[in-house]
Regions:
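Conserved mid-core segment of classical short-chain dehydrogenase/reductases
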Residues: 47-62, 85, 106-109, 149-152, ...
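Short, small/polar-rich loop/turn modules that mediate ligand/substrate recognition or access, typified
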Residues: 129, 134, 190-192
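Alpha-helical segment proximal to the catalytic Tyr-Lys
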Residues: 81, 126-127, 188
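Catalytic Tyr-X3-Lys loop
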Residues: 46, 57-74, 93, 110, ...
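Active-site loop-to-helix junction immediately N-terminal to the catalytic Tyr of the SDR YXXXK motif
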Residues: 103-111, 123
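Short C-terminal tail/terminal secondary-structure segment
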Residues: 50, 180, 191-210
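Residue(s) in the substrate-gating loop at a strand-loop-helix junction
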Residues: 97
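Active-site helix of classical SDR
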Residues: 76, 113, 121
């Protein structure tokens, strides 16, 4: 990325998305560098597989909820306020998951947090529509990232690979292509909904054959 863009096109800002002040400061930094905010992508997310009854109510619920749920809420709020202050339309794109709509073993907190993202997307889209602000979400399935590699460590890598219709993990670049479309003017009619990008993950059960 750094070889493709110069300092006038790309800026960096380290922020803890569980702290609203830091999220707000990130938005202000973008405005100071580029003049305005046009698009906000709330992408930060974490998760760790663990059986529900083995949970520590604090250690296994709060950290995931704070990043996945509070972080998206703070991003929506900070971006929405900036768009309102600018008097300009804008787009807010949240990263959800197929697990927002599906039950699964060992991912209780993650699923709950992503279900919240879907509802925040709907509610924010409704409230912000009069300001010309569009809010939508993308729901990836199994994406080949370091976070997914946790399943290698517990011997489930080949099993989860077969949960895609074509039995291949989605690559991050493929999700980026969907995101680029959703925040573009070509997706102007897409609002208040979550778009699946999962290679059919949620539309079939694990195959008996093959």
């Amino acid at each position: 990325m750094y070889t493709s863009f110069d300092s006038k096109q790309l800026g960096t800002f380290v922020a803890d998305v569980t702290d609203y002040q830091q999220v707000e400061a990130m938005v202000k930094c973008a405005v100071e560098q580029f003049g305005s905010l046009d698009i906000m992508i709330n992408n930060a997310g974490i998760g760790a597989p663990k059986p529900l009854l083995d949970h520590d109510p604090i250690a296994d619920f709060e950290p995931i909820s704070k990043v996945n749920q509070n972080g998206v809420y703070y991003g929506i709020l900070a971006a929405g306020r900036q768009f309102q202050a600018q008097g300009t339309p804008g787009v807010i794109l949240n990263t959800s998951s197929v697990y927002a709509r599906m039950a699964s073993e060992m991912t209780f907190t993650y699923n709950v947090s992503k279900a919240a993202v879907d509802m925040m997307t709907k509610c924010a889209a409704l409230e912000l529509a009069p300001l010309g602000i569009r809010v939508c979400a993308v729901a990836p399935g199994r994406v080949d990232t370091p976070m997914l590699r946790q399943y290698e460590e517990i011997g489930l890598w080949n099993h989860i690979r077969k949960e895609q219709m074509r039995q291949n993990f989605t690559q991050p670049e493929e999700i980026a292509d969907v995101v680029a479309f959703l925040v573009s003017e070509k997706a102007n009619c897409i609002n208040g909904c979550t778009i699946s990008a999962s290679d059919g993950f949620e539309n079939f059960k694990y195959p008996l054959m093959g």
